[in-house]
Swiss-Prot record:
Belongs to the DMRL synthase family. The active site is at residue 88. Forms an icosahedral capsid composed of 60 subunits, arranged as a dodecamer of pentamers. GO terms for molecular function: 6,7-dimethyl-8-ribityllumazine synthase activity. The gene is ribH. Pfam families: DMRL_synthase. Keywords: Riboflavin biosynthesis, Transferase. Its EC number is 2.5.1.78. GO terms for cellular component: cytosol; riboflavin synthase complex. It comes from the Bacteria. This is 6,7-dimethyl-8-ribityllumazine synthase.
Amino acid sequence: MKTYEGELIAEGLRFGIVASRFNHALVDRLVEGAIDCILRHGGREEDITLVRVPGSWEIPVAVGELARREEIDAVIAIGVLIRGATPHFDYIASEVSEGLANLSLELRKPITFGVITADTLEQAIERAGTKHGNKGWEAALSAIEMANLFKKLR
């Protein structure tokens, strides 16, 4: 039986990061975590393209444009959604998730999910680098592994 598995080596890979500006204090921590992860795994800063968009709603369309670039091996989507008093959160969270999943399948390129969806500000803070780690770092780690796996499978 032949088994394929990605490696955690970012050397030679090129990454796109699409990050929302809304909730920028937390998003910036996630972006820093993602970049730190790539660099600590052998990647170079010049091999990272960062795109800023107004909010999480705009993430999928920007991810799609970036992922269509031949030189990009994987894209990391980063944003922070915090539930409010209206159903707006549910609509945005659902559409962003579905949009990113569909793009990854359509484009056959790794697109990882570093979008925090939290019920409270406290939960979001915990996932942006405190109690529950940094979801930007985790999304970058998945992007590294999946980009390497795709290279092996092709």
